[in-house]
Amino acid sequence: MGQKIHPTGFRLGVIKEHRSRWFADPARYPALLQEDDQIRTYLTKQLSSAGLADIQIERKADQIDLEIRAARPGVVVGRGGSSLETLRQGLQKELSALAGQSPGSRGGGERTIRINVVEVTRADAEATLLAENIAQQLERRIAFRRIVRQVIQRAQRAGVQGIKIQIAGRLNGAEIARTEWTREGRIPLHTLRADIDYAEHLAHTTFGIIGVKVWVFKGEVLPGQERHEQKFPLQQPKRRQQRRRPTFEDRSAQEA
C-alpha cells in the first residue's frame, strides 16, 4: 500500500497537514476548490523563476491568506514589494473572472488577499525543487545518469537521510521508452512517522515527454511534534565508497 499511494495523502492527519485549510458550505465548496486550483496555477506560472516549493492557502471570511515557500524570495517580493502588489492584482483579476463563470461563488473583488513569503533554507532537500531541476536539465539534453548523480550528491550534502529518483520516457533519445530509477539511503514509504517529501514533474524534450518522480526522506517525526531542521549533514561514507556510481534498474519489462 505504501508503495502505490501518494506519500503526502497517506500521512495527512498524522504528520502532514492539508495544503488548503478552510471550511465552507456545501453549496460554495466546489467554487472555492476551483479558486484554489486557479490560485496555484497562476502563482506557479508567474513565479517559475523563484524556485517555488509550496503554496499554503487559508480562508477567513472574506480574506485569503497565502503562504509561498520559495528558494528565491527576492524574486517574489521584488524591489519595495512591487512584485507582491502585481501578484495581488493579478490574483484579483483571475478570481473575478472565475467568479463570473462559477455559480455560487462570490465576487473576487470582495476578498482581501494577503501574501506571506517564506524562504526555503535547504533548497536541495525539497523534492519539488529537485524534480524541477532534473526536468530543466533533461530539456537541455544533458545525460540523465549524470543529472541524477549530481542531484543525489547535492541532496546528501543537504543532510537528507534518503532519496529516490525515477525517470520514465525516451531516455537519451532512445527509440523505446523505459523506466529507470535509483535510490540512496532509506525511503520508508510504509512508516507513517517518516517525513517523505514527494514531487513529480514533466520534462518536454524534442523526443517527447519524460516523467520525473522524486522521493526525499527527511527523518522521522512523532505525531503531534514539529520536525526540527537538521543542523548538520549526515556522516558521509568513506571516500572509496562515495565514488561508487548509483545503480539503475530497468522496470520497462515489468510494466509491460
From Swiss-Prot:
Compositional bias (Basic and acidic residues): 246-256
Domain KH type-2 intervals: 39-121
Pfam families for this protein: KH_2, Ribosomal_S3_C
Keywords, sorted A to Z: Ribonucleoprotein, Ribosomal protein, RNA-binding, rRNA-binding
TM stretches of this protein: none
Gene Ontology terms: cellular component: cytosolic small ribosomal subunit
CDD domains per record: KH-II_30S_S3
Family affiliation: Belongs to the universal ribosomal protein uS3 family.
Assembly: Part of the 30S ribosomal subunit. Forms a tight complex with proteins S10 and S14.
Function: Binds the lower part of the 30S subunit head. Binds mRNA in the 70S ribosome, positioning it for translation.
Identification of the protein by name: Small ribosomal subunit protein uS3
Lineage, highest ranks first: Bacteria, Bacillati, Cyanobacteriota, Cyanophyceae, Synechococcales
Gene for this chain: rpsC
